[in-house]
A protein has these predicted regions:
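A short, Lys/Arg-rich alpha-helix, primarily the initiator
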Residues: 1-16
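Residues within the helices of the helix-turn-helix
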Residues: 8, 19, 48
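DNA-binding alpha-helical recognition surfaces that contact promoter or target DNA
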Residues: 9, 34, 63
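The alpha-helix within a helix-turn-helix
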Residues: 11, 22, 51
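Short alpha-helical DNA-recognition segment
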Residues: 16-34
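DNA major-groove recognition helix of helix-turn-helix
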Residues: 36, 46, 65
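Short, basic-rich loop-to-helix N-cap that marks the start of a DNA-contacting helix
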Residues: 39-49
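Short C-terminal boundary/hinge segments that cap the last helix of small helical domains
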Residues: 55-68
Length: 68
């Protein structure tokens, strides 16, 4: 599961929108919304692309994309 609060907080810090995330992942904005809000899962490729967009380093990756 995605740590929704961390992802949304990082998006806010970088002034990114769900449309920006959707463009990065080559998906529709409603799909990006569902993934960010844990309605649909991210696959590993999408998580890696989003981590680059959000400037998340490898040491922080798990805090954003592997929550219980």
């Amino acid at each position: 599961m995605v740590n929704t609060n961390k992802v949304k907080g990082r998006m806010k810090e970088l002034e990114l929108t769900q449309a920006d995330v959707a463009h990065c992942l080559n998906i529709a904005q409603p799909t990006a919304n569902q993934k960010i809000n844990n309605v649909r899962p991210f696959d590993l490729d999408e998580a890696e692309k989003l981590s680059h967009l959000l400037h998340i380093d490898a040491g922080e990756f798990g805090k954003y994309f592997f929550t219980q």
